[in-house]
């Protein structure tokens, strides 16, 4: 086991506890990265001004820099620090808060869902982006196309993608850009109007970050839904519990984003450790969530957990602006899956290959 393999391991949490016991911020000679595993170290890294989301010398990964996916990547607020992060965020974050949970539930319920493996896959990997696309003003048919294209686009965010997948990501970025250019020429939806009124930037920045909103929805929400179903399979007595409460604990207990990275821009000291410019820190968000100094009885799955604290959606200036929306879509989707009568005890799964995500892929589903 190492801190990267852990993300898709059947049960990485005892290993994370071992890492925390060895020190909150330590160097792993096997993967040649600093590893932040304690809540204190994770908080310090995420808050530090010299810890950037991309290396200074490579703001866009070389593998995609020459194509449209790289062009979009370079403008994403989640992949930038400073003004290129703050300006789009200031437009998108408050606008997302205007979305009503009832509206989300209605959009999820309107989708045709079948109680089989294919239906479950679509509910996890296509439905959530379709909801966001509809909120932005696309028709249901366009929303389905946006979902498919987003699935291709997110390949550009993973170092595990091959040349074929990266070529598909570039093509998807081109097509998504075309869809958004057409959308912006139409009278805007309430959500798009709110974002446009707040944005201090050009149309290309807006389009890139709307694509980014779809891609973050795709990645975060699929894992939330899947890990909630696993929690319900293990604790079937929770089927009738509040889905909002269930998802709030799932995102802490078994998050879909297990780790992130930070790149040291200038030599600095973090949590008593000296780091040099150019070094890389693997930030174990999922480990910090299980730190007893952050949450009492962290190994227990408690729906009524008092003062729940979590790093699953980041922290500080890069905290995910779509957290409430992702949780709302996931809660509505899980409830819809349960209402379809799916037998969770017959689910089998493995985790999608990833360096940082914990997203189950289900099979052998019987109605």
Model region roles, listed by residue range:
Residues 1-122, 129-147, 151, 155-159, ...:
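Active-site substrate-recognition loop segments, prototypically the cytochrome P450 B′-helix/B-C loop
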Residues 16, 327-367:
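Cytochrome P450 proximal C-terminal region
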Residues 134-141, 229-240, 289-293, 340, ...:
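Cytochrome P450
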Residues 148-200:
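Cytochrome P450 catalytic core segment centered on helix I
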Residues 186, 240-273:
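Conserved cytochrome P450 K-helix E-x-x-R motif and the immediately C-terminal K′/meander segment
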Residues 197-203, 261-282:
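Cytochrome P450 C-terminal beta-domain/meander region
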Residues 204, 244, 288-328:
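Cytochrome P450 heme-binding Cys-pocket and its upstream "meander" loop
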Residues 206-241, 321-342:
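Cytochrome P450 catalytic-core helices
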């Amino acid at each position: 086991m190492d801190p990267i393999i852990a993300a898709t391991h059947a049960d990485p949490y005892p290993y994370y506890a071992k890492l925390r016991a060895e020190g909150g911020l330590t160097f792993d000679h096997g993967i040649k990265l600093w590893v932040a595993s304690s809540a204190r170290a994770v908080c310090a890294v995420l808050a530090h001004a010299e810890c950037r989301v991309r290396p200074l010398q490579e703001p866009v990964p070389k593998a995609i820099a020459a194509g449209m996916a790289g062009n979009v990547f370079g403008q994403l607020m989640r992949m930038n620090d400073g003004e290129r992060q703050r300006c789009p965020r200031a437009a998108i974050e408050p606008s997302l808060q205007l979305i009503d949970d009832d509206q989300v539930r209605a959009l999820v319920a309107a989708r045709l869902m079948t109680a089989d493996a294919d239906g479950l896959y679509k509910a996890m990997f296509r439905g959530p982006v379709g909801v966001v696309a509809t909120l932005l003003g696309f028709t249901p048919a366009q929303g389905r196309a946006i979902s498919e294209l987003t699935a291709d686009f997110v390949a550009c965010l993973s170092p595990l993608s091959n040349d074929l997948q990266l070529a598909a990501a570039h093509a998807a970025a081109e097509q998504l850009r075309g869809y958004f250019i057409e959308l912006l020429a139409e009278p805007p939806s309430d959500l798009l109007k709110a974002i446009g009124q707040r944005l201090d930037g050009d149309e290309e920045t807006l389009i890139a970050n709307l694509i980014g909103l779809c891609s973050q929805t795709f990645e975060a929400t699929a894992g939330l839904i899947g890990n909630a179903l696993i929690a319900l399979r293990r604790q079937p007595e929770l089927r009738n519990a509040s889905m909002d409460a269930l998802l709030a604990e799932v995102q802490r207990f078994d998050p879909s984003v297990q780790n992130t990275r930070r790149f040291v821009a200038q030599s600095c000291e973090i949590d008593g450790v000296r780091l040099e410019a150019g070094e890389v820190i693997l930030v174990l968000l999922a480990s910090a969530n299980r730190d007893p100094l952050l949450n009492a009885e962290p190994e227990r799955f408690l729906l009524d957990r008092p003062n729940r604290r979590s790093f699953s959606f980041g922290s500080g200036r890069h905290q995910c602006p779509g957290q409430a929306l992702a949780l709302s879509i996931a809660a509505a989707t899980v409830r819809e899956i349960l209402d379809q009568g799916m037998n969770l005890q017959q689910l089998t799964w493995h985790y999608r290959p990833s360096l940082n995500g914990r997203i189950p892929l289900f099979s052998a589903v019987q109605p």
